[in-house]
């Protein structure tokens, strides 16, 4: 995933990075930072579920996070976070047992989730947001 995201944003200038992928949507820059924020949260949630008995996780307001000042930073900061995080996450996933993937956490708004289901969600999440960026590039002939 980190390589596909990096390819999707390669050679975009600041004006392009600050373009929303849809009307009233996040900019490319905000989207990249959101992926880093979201996947950091998910990695911590995985570790909580692996080390605690059905922990209740803390939701966060992702839209508000996307409006914070650090969302204006260069995307390279988040790309490095994503690359390092995914290296660690992939290692952890490879070491997990079938039993580990069935461990659960509780989300206060959406209920029980197994780690296997969460893994599917975040794999989709990566593809979904990367596609937002690649489709914007196609529409604008970037």
Task: Enumerate the language-model features and the residues they cover.
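Acidic/histidine-rich alpha-helical segments that form the ligand environment
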Residues: 1-2, 6-8, 45, 66-102, ...
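A glycine-rich, hydrophobic loop/mini-helix early in the fold
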Residues: 2-22
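A short secondary-structure junction motif
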Residues: 8, 12-15, 53, 96-99, ...
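Short, contiguous alpha-helical
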Residues: 18-63, 90, 104-142
């Amino acid at each position: 995933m980190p390589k596909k995201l990096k390819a999707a944003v390669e050679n975009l200038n600041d004006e392009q990075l600050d373009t929303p992928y849809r009307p009233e949507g996040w900019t490319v820059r905000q989207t990249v930072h959101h992926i880093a924020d979201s996947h950091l949260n998910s990695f911590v949630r995985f570790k909580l579920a692996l080390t605690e008995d059905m922990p209740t996780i803390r939701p966060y307001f992702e839209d508000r996070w996307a409006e914070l000042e650090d969302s204006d930073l260069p995307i390279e900061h988040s790309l490095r976070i994503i690359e390092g995080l995914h290296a660690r996450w992939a290692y952890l996933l490879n070491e997990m047992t079938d039993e580990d993937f069935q461990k659960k956490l509780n989300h206060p708004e959406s209920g029980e989730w197994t780690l296997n289901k969460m893994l599917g969600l975040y794999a989709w999440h990566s593809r979904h947001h990367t596609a937002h960026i690649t489709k914007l590039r196609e529409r604008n002939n970037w």
